[in-house]
Amino acid sequence: MDTGGQHWGKVIWHAYEHLQVPVSETDFRDAYVHAERTLGKNPIIQPDFTFYKTLETKIRLQLEYLQTSYITPLTSYILPLTSHLYEATVAETSKSREVLLSLKKQYPMVLVSNFYGNIATVLKEFKLDGIFDTIIESAVVGVRKPDPQIFTLGVEALGMQPDEVVVVGDSMDKDIIPASKAGCHTVWFKGEGWTNDPVDESPAGKVITDLTQLLVNSE
């Protein structure tokens, strides 16, 4: 919905490359994991944080972590990276919004997300509020992907049976496999992954590479 099917880590790394941040990809990956774990364990992101502020917080944590291993000052890249990534996210979510609005005319929809408790603020920021009938947010419900239970909560919110529900996700491990275990049909939004290792596509009911393909499949 916000990255065109790409893993967020790869999206951020490509921004580092674009802005020529002088760090190695190996070190960046360590910093990315550090920042995600830090945010997952500590209530740093508040309910009123916009996506811009959330993104800036992530980038700051990454660069502060990297700074311990590099002599070159890195914090000057915080704002350029945040602005570059935010601009790309605005463009991507704008395209996704049109697809979601079309789907909403035909189907009830629930958003299931591993997020920090500020998803309502972020959806409003990107004019995506009101599209989903219910939001299942990990920080609120206390269950995270890849636990199939979080998808079961989504099914229950719809008041439907699992085999009546289609889950669309960009992660094979965190979306498609657990959603299948929950009994749902699945569509894998395939994009650039966190690693370059080949991924077995067989667990997915369907595979798409562009969100607009959902409109064709829904006809």
Where are these regions (language model features)?
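Asp-based, Mg2+/Mn2+-dependent phosphohydrolase catalytic module
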Residues: 3, 26, 68-77, 97, ...
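N-terminal helical cap/lid subdomain that shapes the substrate entry/recognition surface
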Residues: 1-97, 105
